[in-house]
Amino acid sequence: IVQDMFLTETCAFADVILPASGWAEKDGTVSNTDRRVQLGRAAVPTPGEARQDLWIIRDIGQGLGLDWHYQHVSEVYEEMRGAMPSINGITWDRLVDKGSVTYPCKDADDAGQSVVFVDAFPTESGKAKLVAAKAVLPDEQPDTEYPMVLMTGRQLEHWHTGSMTRRTQVLDAIEPVPVVYVSPQDMEVAGLEAGGNVTVKSRRGELTAFVRVDAALKQGEIFIPFCYHEAAANLLTNEALDPVGKIPEFKYCAVKLQAA
């Protein structure tokens, strides 16, 4: 089952596709990392058969036998408020009136605490406890066969897999095609020219894309954005898991490159 705004690549694997709403098409709250609870109001209606996520989930829950009879998003928020003491003082009506309130907020008279642990931390000494972390080497290291390090990440213009930003004409016009970033030194060693194509290979796969020189990279490093399905960076990356966090090592692996 896939619930999304667009027919993304993931939808090709789905048995059921549920058309969902975008951020500007639904009511609710957004809580940022600064602990500010902000009220959001739908600016435009959902198109076609698309529905707000809450009502899709509510109806599925009812189909599974749950006693979910919410009629407005405020009912869900108030239920959540009853289970979270930190937002106890932030009622729905208060959000409608103020637009946003920062938690912890204990009661209606609390303006909201933008700074926590003002006097002390909740430790025996009252001070923050800092723990040194040990550096752990990646699972796969460069060698004579694959002498370079591949790093993957986002481009400024495209978010995650680009399901929204690659459908935004202005952003997609700036960065329309897959690209591989290579250091000036490695461009010279490999005989590459900016604007040409380069093939990057790992023990798991290969891809070919447009090459761009990047002086911010050190010799031996290359960077590939992971937002392009037509040159998917994860064809190359290592799926080895971190032993503690169980996070796959998609950001680092050994590769080699050559002119395409």
Segments the model singles out, each with a brief description of its role:
Residues 47-101, 161, 165-181, 185-260:
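Long, contiguous, secondary-structure-rich segments that constitute the structural scaffold
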Residues 5-41:
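Flexible glycine/proline-rich, aromatic-decorated loop/lid segments
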Residues 40, 144, 201-205:
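Short strand-coil-strand connectors
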Residues 5-8, 22-25, 43-45, 49, ...:
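Short, glycine-/Ser/Thr-/acidic-enriched flexible segments
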Residues 1:
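Short beta-strand/loop segments at the ligand-binding rim of alpha/beta enzyme cores
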Residues 10-11, 27-28, 40, 131-132, ...:
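Short helix/loop capping segments that flank catalytic or ligand/cofactor-binding pockets
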Residues 73-170:
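Long, low-complexity segments enriched in small/aliphatic residues
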